[in-house]
Amino acid sequence: MAEHKPDIMYGTTIITVRKGGKVVMAGDGQVSLGQTIMKGNARKVRRLGKSGAVIAGFAGATADAFTLLERLETKLEQYPDQLMRACVELAKDWRTDRYLRRLEAMMLVADKKITLALTGLGDVLEPEDGIMAIGSGGNFALSAARALIDMDLDAETIARKAMNIAAKICVYTNDHFTIETLDAELSSLEKAI
């Protein structure tokens, strides 16, 4: 586990859920500096690109995350409608560029076809079940969403319930959520049902 640096803003919860032809990404609004809550209504989930066809959420150092979001937007311009390729190219840069290597953040990104997590270690990960979460409350939200995914609930309801559970457990997560939704292609599993 990385050493905790008190002068860097840590902690948040970001989750994405794919179900029923929708992809939903939700993030809390708390920004913490060490043990102090600095802001309660930050927007850590946003749309990218001119068309807004990609949604992204970040956890980690805020300035670092914004740098990575800008880089991802540039990659999306280079590789339009190719989220996986844009993310792989960003991950390569993030891993090999001397400046980018120092950035402390993680990102979740999604479009109508795919959801991916990007890390500073060069990882570009796709969830098996259409659910992925990052941040200090990520494991709580992920567990809750997986428990709810087979229930008769839509993607947004699952994301909200999972975020509420994370907010009740994780001290770095609050219940002021930003939620973005996209129409999504049905997964092969959903098509079979």
Curated annotation (Swiss-Prot):
> Activity regulation per the record?
Allosterically activated by HslU binding.
Q: Does the keyword Membrane apply?
A: no
**Which InterPro entries does this chain map to?**
ATP-dep_Prtase_HsIV_su, Ntn_hydrolases_N, Proteasome_sua/b, Proteasome_suB-type
Query: Chief location of this protein?
Result: cytoplasm
> Which CDD domains does the annotation name?
protease_HslV
User: What general EC class does the enzyme of this chain belong to?
Assistant: hydrolase
UniProt keyword list: Allosteric enzyme, Cytoplasm, Hydrolase, Metal-binding, Protease, Sodium, Threonine protease
In its UniProt record, which GO terms are filed under biological process?
proteolysis involved in protein catabolic process
Which residues carry out catalysis? T12
UniProt: Na(+) binding residues: A167, C170, T173
| Record's GO cellular component terms | HslUV protease complex; proteasome core complex
Gene Ontology molecular function, alphabetical:
metal ion binding; threonine-type endopeptidase activity
Localization per record: Cytoplasm
EC number(s): the record gives 3.4.25.2
Q: Which reaction does it catalyse?
A: ATP-dependent cleavage of peptide bonds with broad specificity
- Its biological function? Protease subunit of a proteasome-like degradation complex believed to be a general protein degrading machinery.
What quaternary arrangement does the UniProt entry report? A double ring-shaped homohexamer of HslV is capped on each side by a ring-shaped HslU homohexamer. The assembly of the HslU/HslV complex is dependent on binding of ATP.
The family database entries (HAMAP family) matched by this protein are listed as: HslV
Family of this protein:
Belongs to the peptidase T1B family. HslV subfamily.
The name this protein carries in UniProt is ATP-dependent protease subunit HslV
Q: Which organism is it from?
A: Bartonella henselae (strain ATCC 49882 / DSM 28221 / CCUG 30454 / Houston 1)
At the highest ranks, the source species' classification is: Bacteria, Pseudomonadati, Pseudomonadota, Alphaproteobacteria, Hyphomicrobiales
